[in-house]
């Protein structure tokens, strides 16, 4: 079976979860099954719940992981909603979310993620109603500016939005290739990433509501308050990593009083656990040589030791 995607930080993921014995493991973003396959092999007593919103990825992984069919349950869902759909939540001992776009999605011309694509789609869930086409051709100049500024951190966001609106007034923009030509190839000042790459990333974030989905997922976990459970999140964008870092910091605090209050009044017992990774884990030199797309990957991990379910 030809594998269309290389899982990032595979060794590091296995290291984070190496001490898991029994219970349930939730792979929130199964993709093409690389992480789950390795963990299934190394943890024979763990049962798995494997989730993905991409039907193509799910179908592929069902075939790839057929030897483990008696230990794995598949769920088609966005990972922000999966906690509401699954059983055995109280038995979760490990949770993994790899929230990047797979190589298969990037390289599949019809999905419209690549700047070379003849399509303009970018939906991770192809049942979603809004694609990149609708955003590029119907959003106002102000809305587009906000997307490029907030999600792409582009200094010339207004200029890019203006160019798009000018071109679409002549004819609808129908392909990623066409959009790429409109945006231009230039670098974003001192940054090594091209403005087109940043703009495409910003559009993809808007199409899939990626930051909202991540926040919703973390808020659901906060409400769930798992016991004896390790959570690892792999992100590929500085905004995503910032959100994860902020939530982990919040969860690790005992005191939740306003910083202006001199004396603790909250009981000083609100911590949900400990941060496992003091700094985000990045790809090794060896991995970067094999898979250049791992260069932006950052993994953070948290241990929920919420024994009293406060």
Curated annotation (Swiss-Prot):
Its EC number is 2.1.1.199. The keyword tRNA-binding does not apply. The keyword Transmembrane helix does not apply. S-adenosyl-L-methionine binds at residues 33-35, 52, 79, 98, 105. GO terms for biological process: rRNA base methylation. Belongs to the methyltransferase superfamily. RsmH family. Specifically methylates the N4 position of cytidine in position 1402 (C1402) of 16S rRNA. This is Ribosomal RNA small subunit methyltransferase H. It comes from Campylobacter jejuni subsp. jejuni serotype O:23/36 (strain 81-176). The gene is rsmH.
């Amino acid at each position: 079976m030809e594998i269309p995607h290389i899982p990032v930080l595979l060794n590091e993921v296995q290291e984070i979860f190496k001490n898991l014995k029994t219970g349930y493991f939730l792979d929130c973003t199964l993709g093409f099954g690389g992480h789950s396959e390795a963990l299934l092999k190394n943890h024979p007593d763990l049962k798995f719940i494997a989730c993905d919103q991409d039907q193509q990825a799910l179908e592929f992984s069902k075939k790839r992981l057929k030897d483990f069919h008696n230990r794995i349950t598949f769920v088609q869902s966005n990972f922000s909603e999966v906690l509401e759909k699954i059983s055995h939540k109280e038995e979760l001992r490990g949770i993994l979310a790899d929230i990047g776009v797979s190589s298969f999605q990037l390289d599949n011309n019809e999905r419209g993620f690549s700047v070379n694509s003849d399509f303009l789609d970018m939906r991770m869930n192809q049942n979603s109603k809004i694609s990149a086409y609708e955003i590029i051709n119907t959003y106002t100049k102000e809305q587009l500016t906000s997307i490029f500024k907030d999600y792409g951190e582009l200094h010339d966001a207004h200029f890019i939005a203006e160019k798009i609106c000018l071109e679409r007034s002549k004819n609808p923009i129908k392909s990623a290739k066409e959009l790429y030509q409109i945006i231009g190839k230039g670098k974003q000042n001192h940054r090594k990433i091209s403005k087109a790459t940043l703009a495409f990333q910003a559009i993809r974030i808007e199409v899939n509501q990626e930051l909202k989905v991540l926040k919703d997922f973390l808020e659901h976990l906060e409400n769930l308050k798992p016991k004896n459970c390790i959570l690892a999140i792999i992100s590929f964008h500085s905004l995503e990593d910032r959100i994860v870092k902020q939530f982990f910091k919040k969860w690790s605090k005992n005191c939740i009083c306003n910083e202006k209050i001199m004396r603790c009044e909250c009981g000083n017992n609100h911590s949900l656990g400990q941060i496992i990774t003091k700094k985000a884990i990045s790809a090794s030199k060896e991995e970067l040589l094999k898979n250049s797309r791992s260069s932006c990957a950052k993994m953070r991990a948290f241990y929920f030791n919420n024994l009293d379910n406060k």
